[in-house]
Amino acid sequence: MGKEKTHINIVVIGHVDSGKSTTTGHLIYKCGGIDKRTIEKFEKEAAEMGKGSFKYAWVLDKLKAERERGITIDISLWKFETTKYYITIIDAPGHRDFIKNMITGTSQADCAVLIVAAGVGEFEAGISKNGQTREHALLAYTLGVKQLIVGVNKMDSTEPAYSEKRYDEIVKEVSAYIKKIGYNPATVPFVPISGWHGDNMLEPSPNMPWFKGWKVERKEGNASGVSLLEALDTILPPTRPTDKPLRLPLQDVYKIGGIGTVPVGRVETGILRPGMVVTFAPVNITTEVKSVEMHHEALSEALPGDNVGFNVKNVSVKDIRRGNVCGDSKADPPQEAAQFTSQVIILNHPGQISAGYSPVIDCHTAHIACKFAELKEKIDRRSGKKLEDNPKSLKSGDAAIVEMVPGKPMCVESFSQYPPLGRFAVRDMRQTVAVGVIKNVEKKSGGAGKVTKSAQKAQKAGK
């Protein structure tokens, strides 16, 4: 076996008809966790339904349908392997809650793969003012996905097929607009592919002898290659934020007979260890962690990315809840936010948003109404430059700096310090109307909170 490969998360973005499903389906199909039997079954069904020409997307559609019906599919189906990495596709748009998932998502994507269609008229539709391509790329960048790969898809349907001229034209245009967003095109591999026929997906295509390969230049080291698979191998693996103080947003709290109160959640930053004295915010309760476990096995430490349950002493299941944040009481313990300043981008709101607007904010696992108390300035969404002070209102497409006040006690952090606790989705009318990143947080100076007996003991012993 040797050493396990590093795990990488990618998000696949692009216009609705760019061929995202076919492309991802192809990778999963050829390098992935779908066993031969399932593939044969899918192929047979696809053929019977006259969808033979659609088999890769069909595989993905089947998986998506199962996912949407709430059947949790074997997640290995969304994984595939490259020579260096295990890659998980954490989400692909087209999914109703894609934007919300991308923000509150259980995991941050390490890289975005942008698929653009090269077919006649298709590229133009995707990149036009109201195309989704720009929106998705902007979102990815705003939410901290700083690595990008571009697949120029459907090269088989250009005029003439596999046209170098068309490819060059698209690369030029996409480079210009990802640059406006903030990506540096020199660090972005561009690959001409056909997700359907398989050109340049896993190996060099004989249909594009003119394509000499892609190159990236960056301080971490230059790279080059030909296929999309090779481009995925150039992704720089994430550094786990173990050196930051602990932040663990609670997903649930269970009461387990014979054990007691067991909060469950994912370590976002720092390390959780048994014996540690932790503080829960915004409730301001401090107690000792007795044990930590993952998949029913006791751990001596839990690291960022680990979903764990941990047993806490002298705390009732009524005291803490989903959306609370657990941290180390000795290292920058989490606190309730009195208010926070955010950079917000309005995505799709039918009317005008003015001061006083109070939608629900989804930030990490918290789901709380917050008031847009003050619209401080309207800014250019790409450069961040100020356009006007104290705008009267905001509409779709606008970006602004906004002062926000939670309607109920809530714990959030600045994006620069704790990224997963500093990005949020604004939900209204059953959709994501805006996204935001938190610039700074004014903490509520809490009085003395509740410190349990076991915490006092542990603190004394630790002195």
From Swiss-Prot:
PROSITE patterns: G_TR_1, G_TR_2. The modification Phosphothreonine is found at residue 239. The modification N,N,N-trimethylglycine is found at residue 2. It catalyses: GTP + H2O = GDP + phosphate + H(+). Keywords: Acetylation, Elongation factor, Endoplasmic reticulum, GTP-binding, Hydrolase, Magnesium, Membrane, Metal-binding, Methylation, Nucleotide-binding, Phosphoprotein, Protein biosynthesis. GTP binds at residues 17-22, 153-154, 156, 194-196. One of its GO terms (molecular function) is translation elongation factor activity. This is Elongation factor 1-alpha 2. It comes from Mus musculus (Mouse).
